Amino acid sequence: MEPPNLYPVKLYVYDLSKGLARRLSPIMLGKQLEGIWHTSIVVHKDEFFFGSSGISSCTPGGTLLGPPDSVVDVGNTEVTEEIFLEYLSSLGESLFRGEAYNLFEHNCNTFSNEVAQFLTGRKIPSYITDLPSEVLSTPFGQALRPFLDSIQIQPPGGNSVGRPNGQS
């Protein structure tokens, strides 16, 4: 019996604050944050992410965010590209429609965590998934929540996944 093909799975991590969170968070929040994280999953030679337009893909590092600030090796998967794209299509029609996006509760990191677990059985690092609750646990975070809840983030430069001809 031939061993299954294994495909590497990477987590691309971007600091949307470009270092400002590290400098300003102690003053504004009373606690140190290392960054404001956007994440995506790289598998089968493409980068996949979730934003206010739904699930998108691009060549790795191909959004206007440029190259990631760090790359986490999530592991390997036996899931073929065909099965993975079917899975993404079903997610895009259910849990990860664009209108389901919420900066604190259902965001790019929620998507990356879900997909990482599907592909490898492993979660993404907790310093990323815990960030919203860390911010909201501060008085400043609570005061900003109504404004921040209205923010929709969609990194430019990706192609829609699971919609015919890239339609939204």
From Swiss-Prot:
Leader sequence segment: none
Catalyzed reactions per annotation: S-hexadecanoyl-L-cysteinyl-[protein] + H2O = L-cysteinyl-[protein] + hexadecanoate + H(+)
Molecular-function GO term, any one: deSUMOylase activity
Domain PPPDE: from-to ranges: 7-149
Keywords annotated in UniProt: Cytoplasm, Hydrolase, Nucleus, Protease
Active site (record annotation): 38, 108
Name listed for the protein in its UniProt record: Desumoylating isopeptidase 1
Organism of derivation: Mus musculus (Mouse)
Underlying gene: Desi1
